[in-house]
Amino acid sequence: MAKFGRLTPIRFLVLGVLVLAATSWAQKRSPIAEQIAKAYGLDSLGQVEAIRYTFNLELPGRNVSHSWFWEPKTGKISYEGKDKDGKPVKVTFVQSELKGDSPVVKDKIDWLFVNDNYWLVFPFHVYWDSPGAEVQEMGVQKLPLGKGSGKLVKVQYPKGGYTPGDTWDMYVGSDGRIKEFVYHRGNPKSPVPGIVIVTWAGYKKAGPLLFSTDHRGTADGKPVRISFSNVAVKLVGSDTWINAQ
């Protein structure tokens, strides 16, 4: 399997707030996490040279968009959007080469990338992170938002980082696709939302990869929508972008 630029240390932002999770790569990856990731094209990720996308966040009284270009193998990232102070910015960097005093770090642009990228390819990250997380199959459960049911797969990170014990519940269909997703905050003193419940809809395929481009639901009971636009992939050896459709 091709090697890809890992997002290290493992960092997850829920609606823009940083969460750190400790991971041990010595343990074995989860079979169910691998099964889900394969439904989204994990086995074909090596064919992909670059992915571009725009992350859109809609909250009451607040809309945010970030545009990204990402090379999974090299870790090269380009960003167009705003910095932490709301000023327009364009920047290109390789995350593994960043230092603590880098403007990209100080302006939290790399943090934004990790957040947005987790939402875009969350099944891949669950698989990559599974050696250091507890992944459990909980049987078929009723969906928290919509009608119907799905296999509940619970992912809990260890007691470490800024919000220890954070949990993600994936409700998975028979086709391996996530139907709905619930985030539970582990640390009640953390500033992130206590619970985020969203749909996984708007499925589109770009090349060999499958993306969920529309997530609607609530964050601590308030409406939230996270969506992706301008999603496309470029395959190795090609100059043509394949749009998600």
Regions found by a protein language model. Give the residues of each.
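N-terminal mature ectodomain segment of secretory-pathway/periplasmic proteins
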Residues: 31-106, 133, 137-140
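Gly/Pro-enriched, hydrophobic low-complexity segments
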Residues: 147-244
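Bacterial N-terminal signal peptides
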Residues: 11-21
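Intrinsically disordered terminal and processing segments
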Residues: 28-31, 39-43, 86, 90, ...
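Tryptophan-centric aromatic hotspots in well-structured domains and transmembrane helices
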Residues: 45, 70-72, 119, 168, ...
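Flexible, processing/modification-adjacent segments and terminal tails
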Residues: 25-35, 96-166, 188-192, 244-245
